[in-house]
Amino acid sequence: SAKKAGAQKVVLIERDERAGGILQQCIHNGFGLHKFKEELTGPEYGERYEQMTFEEGVQLLTDTTVTDLSRDRIVTCINETGCFKIKAEAVVLAMGCRERPRGALNLAGDRPSGVMTAGTAQKFVNIKGYMPGRKIVILGSGDIGLIMARRMTLEGAEVKAVCEIMKDSGGLTRNIVQCLRDFDIPLRLRHTVTQVHGRERVEGVTIALVDEMLRPVEGTEEYIECDTLMLSVGLIPENELSKKAGVEIDPKTKGHVVDENRQTTCEGIFACGNVVKVHELVDFVSEEGETAGYAAACYAAGRPLETIHHSEKRISEKKGVKNLADETDPAVICTVCPIGCRIKVERVKDGYVTEGNNCKRGEAYAIKEVTSPERTLTTIMASDCKKMIPVKTDRPVPKEKIEELMKIINEKTLLLPISLGDIIIENIGGTGANVVCTRSFNI
């Protein structure tokens, strides 16, 4: 966005070995419905933007950490070449957010191994290829907790329960259906973990019902044997660098205070995405990035700032179990677009009729969900270079065949290099679907 707006030089600094941020480990689908009008995995979405930066001539510094940012826009960096400073005409902060750690919770017990955030577990499994445990309890039902419940199940672990202290889940309704109900994983609302058991390694946890004041109710304690406790208890905007520069932080969101052009309280320093506030969808983060990049380029060139207005109305997807009656509810939550229609399907003499859908695609999806449900399978494959490569089926496959298909995929080893979209396995399991690569990798 900054380059397109006329910036002479744009430098993108990334502390990881590759651009893309958290998207690299978000191998599941559901991204891009707003931005690209199609459903992508996280790596696919990230690679599209990576390619755009190359095409625009953006200089990318990977494996580079920013250690300091001053109010006059001097950026201090360090990488394998040493420590250096960049004097910028404008700076855009896009560091994202971090997970709320165990230290922010009131968990009794020792500090054994096996307690980790859901994002850490996601990186272990999807990037490193390590299984952090076999018997899992998840505290918190945000989307990453729900997604990791499914991911761990696909990899052969047993998810004993997802515990949520509130009356409803903060996760998307479609994730509750596809990540929990698809695999019969119990969601324990108004429950929290009161104690962690084990010294060297987690051996189990005690959970309890909470009252209206979110206090554990005496006599409702229940012990669950497990070797891993995953925490999905909220996200906090990353703001340590910004504080050094003197950027004002909102006391409620913990994010940066910005104006309509995403300029912070420090002139020439802009912020976008999850450093401002935690967003539901990456598509909205991208929109904010475009706004901030354009405004930063205008500021650097001394041009007046013109506020960007995005034409598309932002539609938040439905959240929580409140959109579901019970597990015998005949209604289907449609996932073909962000609206998430609640569609009732009824059998009639000549087939099926639907009620509640806004389009023909929703009608077709709902009938398919009732008669022969399908899912797009997303997972990883090992490579000859020890890297884990994200893959997916190029079309939905029968839900009941997913376990069988996982076994086929896990028996294979990929040879690098490989490119985005390359077919790895044709007609896997006789489903008519091909397994394709969702991120390019060189040797």
Go through the PLM ranges and name each one.
Residues V321-L414, I418-E426, A433-C437:
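Signature of N-terminal electron-transfer/Fe-S-associated modules in redox systems
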Residues R439-F441:
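Extended, charged alpha/beta regions that create polyanion-binding interfaces
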Residues S1-A325, C334-R342, R347-V353, N357-E363, ...:
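Residues forming the flavin
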Residues L107, I425-I428:
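A general structural signal for short secondary-structure junctions and capping/turn motifs
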